[in-house]
C-alpha cells in the first residue's frame, strides 16, 4: 500500500510532500515481497542526494513496518514505453540523465538491480530519480535476497545475464538494464522479449538482439554502438561505469565505432549454436568485488586544453563541461 501523507510543523504548515509505504502482510503473501520491503527499509536511509527520494522515517516489523519518504511529483517513465519509438534526441536525453543517476547510486556502494522505466521518475528540473530498492544490493549491508532465495531476482526483460546466473554484486548489471531501456525507446521493441521462465531468461546468454538500425533506419550508428555495448553478454565488454555511458550520450563525437555500429542483422546459426553450447551449465567467471572496487578499476581520461587565447564563449562551455563531468 502507498499513501500520500504530509509532514506538518507546529504552526500547522505542511512541508515536504511525502509518501508512506506499508507492506501487505497476509497469509499466502509472496515471501520475496516481504523480504524486499525489509531490504528497502535497510537501504533507503543510507542513500543521499537528488537522485533518490529523501528518507524520512521507518517502522520495524515488531510493530508496524512502514517507510516514509519524499514524494516525487509527476509520473514514472513507464507511460513513455507505450509511445515508443521516441525521437532520437529524447532517447539520448533520457539515457544521459538516467545514467547520471545510476552512477550516483554506484558511488554510494549500491547496485539497483531493477532499473526499468517504472522505477525512474524526474524532478521538475529534469533530474532523474531512481525508486524502489527492494531488489537492490548494498556493499555494507547483508544481502537478504541472496541468502533467502534460489531463483534469479529481477524483472525479466531487464535482467542481465549475470543476474540470471545469480550474480548480484556487479554494477554493470544496471548498465545492461539501461541498454534494454534505450533499445526499447529507440525501436519500440524489447531486445529479449518478456520471458517468464528461467529457460527463457537464459536465452540472452547466447542469442543477441536484432540490431536497432535494422528496425529503425534513422538510428545513428554511434547510438547503436552505445546500445549494443550495454547489451554485451560479458560485463567486461560493456561500459565499465554509468558515468562513461552518460559522457558518450552527451558527446556522440567521442564514441569509438566498432563492428557493433555496422551490424544490420543478428548473428548466424553457427555462431549462435557455439554461444548456446558454451552457455550450457556455464557459471560466470566473476570476482566477488565491491562496487567501489569496480569503479576504481575504470579508466580515467584527462585532457589538457590551452585557454590562453580562448573566447569567453569557449571558456563558459569548458566550465559547463567540467561541471557535468564532476556531477557524473
Model segments located where?
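AlphaC helix of the eukaryotic protein kinase fold
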Residues: 24-46
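Activation-segment/catalytic-loop signature of the eukaryotic protein kinase fold
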Residues: 58
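Conserved short submotifs of the Hanks-type protein kinase catalytic core
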Residues: 62-76
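Activation segment signature within eukaryotic-like protein kinase domains
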Residues: 94-95
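Protein kinase catalytic-loop region centered on the HRD/HxD motif
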Residues: 100-110
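Structural helix C-cap motif within protein kinase domains
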Residues: 187-191
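Conserved HRD-motif arginine in the catalytic loop of eukaryotic-like protein kinases
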Residues: 238
Amino acid at each position: 500500500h502507498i499513501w500520500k501523507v504530509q509532514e506538518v510543523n507546529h504552526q500547522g504548515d505542511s512541508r515536504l510532500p511525502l509518501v508512506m509505504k506499508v507492506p501487505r502482510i497476509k497469509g499466502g503473501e509472496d515471501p520475496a515481497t516481504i523480504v524486499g520491503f525489509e531490504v528497502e527499509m535497510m537501504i533507503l536511509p543510507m542513500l543521499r542526494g537528488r537522485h533518490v527520494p529523501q528518507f524520512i522515517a521507518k517502522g520495524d516489523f515488531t510493530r508496524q513496518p512502514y517507510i516514509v519518504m519524499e514524494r516525487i511529483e509527476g509520473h514514472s517513465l513507464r507511460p513513455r514505453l507505450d509511445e515508443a519509438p521516441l525521437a532520437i534526441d529524447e532517447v539520448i536525453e533520457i539515457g544521459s540523465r538516467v545514467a547520471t543517476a545510476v552512477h550516483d547510486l554506484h558511488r554510494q556502494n549500491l547496485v539497483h538491480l531493477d532499473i526499468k522505466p517504472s522505477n525512474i521518475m524526474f524532478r521538475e528540473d529534469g533530474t532523474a530519480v531512481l525508486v524502489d530498492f527492494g531488489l537492490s544490493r548494498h556493499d555494507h549491508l547483508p544481502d537478504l535476497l541472496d541468502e533467502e532465495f534460489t531463483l534469479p531476482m529481477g524483472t525479466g526483460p531487464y535482467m542481465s545475464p549475470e543476474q540470471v546466473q545469480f550474480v548480484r554484486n556487479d554494477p554493470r548489471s544496471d548498465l545492461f538494464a539501461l541498454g534494454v531501456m534505450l533499445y526499447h525507446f529507440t525501436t519500440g521493441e524489447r531486445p529479449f522479449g518478456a520471458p517468464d521462465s528461467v529457460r527463457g531468461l537464459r536465452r540472452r546468454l547466447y542469442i543477441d538482439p536484432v540490431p536497432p538500425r535494422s528496425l529503425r533506419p534513422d538510428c545513428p550508428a554511434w547510438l547503436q554502438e552505445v546500445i549494443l555495448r550495454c547489451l554485451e553478454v560479458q560485463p567486461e565488454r560493456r561500459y565499465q561505469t554509468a558515468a562513461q555511458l552518460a559522457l558518450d550520450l552527451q558527446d556522440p563525437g567521442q564514441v569509438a565505432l566498432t563492428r557493433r555500429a555496422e551490424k544490420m542483422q543478428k548473428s548466424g546459426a553457427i555462431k549462435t549454436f557455439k554461444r548456446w553450447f558454451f552457455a550450457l551449465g556455464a557459471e560466470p567467471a566473476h570476482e566477488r568485488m565491491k562496487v567501489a572496487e569496480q569503479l576504481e578499476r575504470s579508466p580515467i581520461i584527462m585532457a589538457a586544453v590551452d585557454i590562453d587565447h580562448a573566447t569567453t564563449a569557449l571558456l563558459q562551455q569548458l566550465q559547463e563541461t567540467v561541471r557535468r563531468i564532476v556531477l557524473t
